[in-house]
Structures are given as C-alpha cells and as structure tokens.
Amino acid sequence: MRVGHGFDIHKFGKIYKPLILGGVHIPYCKGVVSHSDGDVIIHSIIDSLLGASSLGDIGILFPNNDIKYKNINSCILLQVVWNCIKKKYKIGNIDVTLFLEYPKISSYTNKICLCISNCLKCKTDVINIKSKTMEGLGEIGKKKGIASEAVSVLLEI
C-alpha cells in the first residue's frame, strides 16, 4: 500500500474563466487565475497519485510555462498520469477536501465523483469529496481563492 498527498490553490481573478471542480463546470460569478483550466480538485488528486507512486509532481510533468497546457482540461492530465500508474497500482481510495466559501458544492459532489471515477476507471465508492469553509479567515475565507487537498491510497497489483 502506498499513500500520497496533494494540494493545489488558485486565486479568483477578474478575467472570467469557468469554475471547473473535479471535471464539472460549477456555475459561479468568478473563475480562477491559472495556466490550465485551474481545476484544484483534479490537480490535488494528480499530485497525490504522483506522490504515492514516487513520480514527482504536477509542475514537473505539466509545466505552467508550456503553451500546450494552456487552458487544457485537467481531466486529460489526470488520465495521462493514471496511464503511467495503472500498470503497477489500483486505487484503494481517494479522499478530497475542498476549501472555499462559495459556491456551495454539495449538490455537485456525486457528479464530481462520477467524473473522477470515469477518468480513473474505478468505482465511485472509492472517491470521497467534501468541502469546508474557512469561516471568513484568510484569503480563501475572504472569497479571494479556492484550495483542495487530496490523499490517495494505491494498492499494488
């Protein structure tokens, strides 16, 4: 069994970019400042999977100064990473905590789990998504950004 941890954070920006979380478009008046689509959930999962498999981090594999990753759908990046890992491991579970004040995502969590499970070709019951507010504290609490943390357990096959 191998365990990996991932984290990602993006600030909300003035330039509107759709808010994508776990591969799902979430209606909101703000988007994130990012090179790719800025999907903090997928980015934290990618880093946790890379950590569990000792394959580095998202910034090394997909540098933010490479034009081919400009506005790329992060689900594509997740599939690329999983294709490197799936020969040796299967998903034990993935646990994600999203930190944000708004929008509320509870009505989207099942759809997010389904999207992630489709990318990873695993069952939805091994993926957990939850969100926490920052109670008005810090930049996220002031609605200036969004962050995600993920822990992945990989099992050798």
UniProtKB/Swiss-Prot annotation:
| Keywords annotated in UniProt | Isoprene biosynthesis, Lyase, Metal-binding
Q: Does the keyword Glycoprotein apply?
A: no
EC nos: 4.6.1.12
Q: What's the catalysed reaction?
A: 4-CDP-2-C-methyl-D-erythritol 2-phosphate = 2-C-methyl-D-erythritol 2,4-cyclic diphosphate + CMP
Query: Required co-factor?
Result: a divalent metal cation
Binding locations of a divalent metal cation: 8, 10, 43
Q: In which pathway does it act?
A: Isoprenoid biosynthesis; isopentenyl diphosphate biosynthesis via DXP pathway; isopentenyl diphosphate from 1-deoxy-D-xylulose 5-phosphate: step 4/6
Q: Does the keyword Lyase apply?
A: yes
One GO-annotated biological process of the protein: isopentenyl diphosphate biosynthetic process, methylerythritol 4-phosphate pathway
User: Where in the chain is the site Transition state stabilizer?
Assistant: 35, 133
MF-aspect GO terms: 2-C-methyl-D-erythritol 2,4-cyclodiphosphate synthase activity; metal ion binding
Q: How is the cofactor bound?
A: Binds 1 divalent metal cation per subunit.
- Which residues make up the binding site for 4-CDP-2-C-methyl-D-erythritol 2-phosphate? 8-10, 35-36, 57-59, 62-66, 142
Q: How does it assemble?
A: Homotrimer.
NCBIfam families tied to this protein = ispF
Which HAMAP family does this entry report, sorted A to Z? IspF
Q: What does this protein do?
A: Involved in the biosynthesis of isopentenyl diphosphate (IPP) and dimethylallyl diphosphate (DMAPP), two major building blocks of isoprenoid compounds. Catalyzes the conversion of 4-diphosphocytidyl-2-C-methyl-D-erythritol 2-phosphate (CDP-ME2P) to 2-C-methyl-D-erythritol 2,4-cyclodiphosphate (ME-CPP) with a corresponding release of cytidine 5-monophosphate (CMP).
Q: Which family does it belong to?
A: Belongs to the IspF family.
The name this protein carries in UniProt is 2-C-methyl-D-erythritol 2,4-cyclodiphosphate synthase
